[in-house]
């Protein structure tokens, strides 16, 4: 390597990549990159790594305030400063011209004979004036780039916060749900324990009574054994008298004390069926409290009649006198409840009994209520329904509703909504201790949601049965 190349390499190695000046108080973090101590101290600290400073080159964490100044490198910088500045390190001529193609300050020899030969060359003073005029524009470009990166960093910071918040809420929900399960299982364990204790007490009491009787007979038998030993050497008359008495008593004891039978203790069998029953009961117990909802008559289509208490709705054969409300359904025989939701978990039940045609679920605040309804999730409808009293359907994005396999004929439908889990599930809740899942929609819900009910046309009385919101009396809660 020639001396000029060596000098150029030294200048590059002794230059701070932050201030583009020769090192001042150089420090070297563990990653091996070197900067001025003041420059590295001015770099913003990490917010998530105990306040460490990232290396501007490789992002490795460092603490510039704890780093020692590299004295050997500092002395080398001082020695390099003795080299004449403002001169070409290759030809040692003044840096008097500027190469516009390579954007580099060079000497006359570089321009006429060196690697810049044939390039567009201007004097250093011309370049200074020209670039001075361009400086404001360059500053604007730099500022725009900085602002763009700041926005990107802000977006990433928000995304990091959202991820942390999502995970935190997930952990909290897991803890809440598992604590609820543990609580229910503890209650179940205590209940089964009491049942077992009661069975044990009854069985033990019966056994102790029988044991007391057997103990009394045992005492008599031992006494008779002693009598028989005594009569063995007695005279004929006395022997016969006592022997007959003992024999009679023995026969009586044997007749009065049959051998003990097997005592059965009535305890639950811990089988797979038992575990399944416990799971079903626990699942029902962990559901949110039943919502006490009422139908909103101001949203009911004009053929619908809502009961005075707001718990029942049916389709009449004549139009009702209703006000013109923007939220009222005008064509379909539908309505929503007065209650609506924007967060949390919710559960409600609707009595359908033997009504042959109906639909229910949830709709978004922005779902269209005028004209023909296009009941799909993309249009803000998450519903299931029944037609002909036997065909159950989920209104998905497919061209035709998805037919559901349903055992029997549900008399009551439960609807479970969870904003955090992004689900709305439908259950056959005819048996409150045995909810049967019918269908689940998965959706990332946003905005306000309304419980939705489609009573359907009365069909000349064939479908005149009402839909009823189920809510038990206070004494049954």
Curated annotation (Swiss-Prot):
It is found in: Cell membrane, Sarcolemma; Cytoplasmic vesicle membrane. One of its GO terms (molecular function) is ubiquitin protein ligase activity. Zn(2+) 2 binds at residues 29, 31, 53, 56. Keywords: Cell membrane, Coiled coil, Cytoplasmic vesicle, Disulfide bond, Exocytosis, Membrane, Metal-binding, Transferase, Transport, Ubl conjugation pathway, Zinc, Zinc-finger. Specifically binds phosphatidylserine. The binding to phospholipids enhances ubiquitination activity. Disulfide bond formation at Cys-244 occurs in case of membrane damage that cause the entry of the oxidized milieu of the extracellular space, resulting in homooligomerization. The keyword Metal-binding applies. A zinc finger (B box-type) spans 83-124. The keyword Protease does not apply. Pathway: Protein modification; protein ubiquitination. Gene3D superfamilies: 2.60.120.920, Classic Zinc Finger, Zinc/RING finger domain, C3HC4 (zinc finger). A zinc finger (RING-type) spans 16-59. This is Tripartite motif-containing protein 72. It comes from Xenopus laevis (African clawed frog).
